[in-house]
Curated annotation (Swiss-Prot):
Region (G3): 264-267
Chief place of localization: cytoplasm
Residue ranges occupied by any tr-type G domain in the UniProt entry: 209-378
Protein name as it appears in the record: Translation initiation factor IF-2
GO cellular component terms listed in the entry, alphabetical order: cytosol
Subcellular locations according to the entry: Cytoplasm
Keyword field contains Mitochondrion: no
Region named G1: 218-225
GO molecular function, one term: translation initiation factor activity
Domain of life, per lineage: Bacteria
Region (G2): 243-247
Protein's organism: Staphylococcus carnosus (strain TM300)
Amino acid sequence: MSKQRIYEYAKDLNLKSKDVIDELKKMNVEVSNHMQALEPNEIKELDKKFKPGSSKDKQDNKAAQNNHKKHQNNNKDKNNNNNGGNAKKNNKKNHNNKNQKNNKNNKNNKNQKQAPKQEAVKEMPEKITYTEGITVGELAEKMNIESSNIVKKLFLLGIMANINQSLDDETVELIADDYGIEIEKEVVIDEEDLDIYFDDEEEDPDAIERPAVVTIMGHVDHGKTTLLDSIRNTHVTEGEAGGITQHIGAYQIENDGKKITFLDTPGHAAFTTMRARGAQVTDITILVVAADDGVMPQTIEAINHAKEADVPIIVAVNKVDKPTANPDRVMQELTEYGLFPEDWGGDTIFVPLSALSGDGIDDLLEMIVLVSEVQELKANPEKRAVGTVIEAELDKSRGPAASLLVQNGTLNVGDAIVVGNTYGRVRAMVNDAGKRVKSAGPSTPVEITGINDVPQAGDRFVTFSDEKQARRIGEARHEESIIQQRQESKNVSLDNLFEQMKQGEMKDLNIIIKGDVQGSVEALAASLMKIDVEGVNVRIIHTAVGAINESDVTLANASNGIIIGFNVRPDSGAKRAAEQENVDMRLHRVIYNVIEEIEAAMKGMLDPEYEEKVIGQAEVRQTFKVSKVGTIAGCYVTDGKITRNAGVRVIRDGIVVFEGQLDTLKRFKDDVKEVAQGYECGITIEKFNDIKVDDIIEAYEMVEIQR
């Protein structure tokens, strides 16, 4: 028996591929998708399930064939007896008998040939499945009817179509409904899209509780690394230059039998770089605020990042053991950003602690466990391993290495894996304690080697049973990423805003405002919120006082937003990042101009900006006055070139005396399009004849600024 794919088997029996896959799983057969080939023994087992009467039918057919043969033998015996009894009859009668016998045989033969035609008439199925773009011929075949019948139906509906015409979903539904057939559209699975392997954990009945993934964020020197150091009882801060976290790591601790995974991130990478690539890894955010310092600019940024990612926040009020500590002031300041303490009737958990002495750490861990229990975080360790890259590097001795966070399933040494646009086989696996491990379950951070290249932080990974499949998918994703890099970024800007609105791609215009003083920022934000254009809502996602920095650009890129600077400039890092990520930055000094520009962009009326570009200069050596023409300037091009369509200005003793357009440009008696440096020419200027010797004619053109 030849091999057959799952969907082909399902199609032959008018079944759903899902039903066949479910039955295979009951048979303990590992199934990746509907394209998997079936073994002969698997087909036999499926036949027993889906063709319960197949063996009985065969026996009935055999019995019918035997009866037919017996009937034919009896007829032959009777014919022989009759022939023996009538042997003495004349030849004419014999001849007639033969003709009659032949006629009977011919009739029998005709009936035998026509019988299969009656059997070939198939009944229309009650339900069919179809793929997008199905043709008339393919639909007719699935419905067991003639293609001409569908063509007639379409003609009556006012649709001219032939047998090879593709049909849209609505037309297929109309035809099927007319024949009383239920239809279902087959979903074509793109195996190169790793997102399809990230199942919704809540829908999995076999999912079990998993550890929470926690990110610690806050302002510089408020004690983020010291807090994490105190939690896991190690000394990272002492070995780091300037006390600043210099790498991304992930660490797992155990508290009262419950595991918690912490991401140690520089700045807000967990919420920006990863979220910009579509990854969501964090379950809970710990916002560290120093009790003696209060809310600072990076604290506000951290709040905005966490809210944008829709992640619950636990506020850790650090340094409460200092004499100048004022926890109540911190609570008061955070209420301005929507974080209301539980003691004041809000829903935000505040935990006072000292990262240095360790006071309050147990309370914080208890709150983390409590919040994670409320969230009901679950995963299925029996599934294929999927997750996200936390960090990656090229190690001199080990080659490409990647720190991964397993989000679902179990990752094992030897698994074939696709990580972002890279692929390979897990050669070795090390946990956060530096020990080699053979497997890692959900919410477990590990570092792996064995991939062919260095992936990016935030890339997703998926394991496969077949290394060839992993290689094929990895190579295809790599080629696709190269093509995408060559294409223009689709980040929103005021220039393409109206186009995206028309295509239905834009629902919210995310704006980040940076200004010189708080009053200006608040006034600008209030004015922008009043803009009312059908189709798009203005959404202020972050406001702050100070220069535009790299963090603002990263947030704008992650949120597909634009940055407005009011009386402030971007620093060098922000400029470079904005150019790399194609983030639109607008700098203004007048509030009215900001509102007018954004409103015009939303209405599709944003005028292009132009700048003047000087293309050449010519010195007037001699003048000629001609009736009906005016003054002709005999010139020598001293710099660049003079073109016929250029704008010109006449400069006399360093002062511009006239600005207008060229009328004619000639060399000898011929009209020319341009005259280059070092050549002489004749020039006349529209509506200006007061040209004098030694005047300088400067040519320029207006060039549109690329935004």
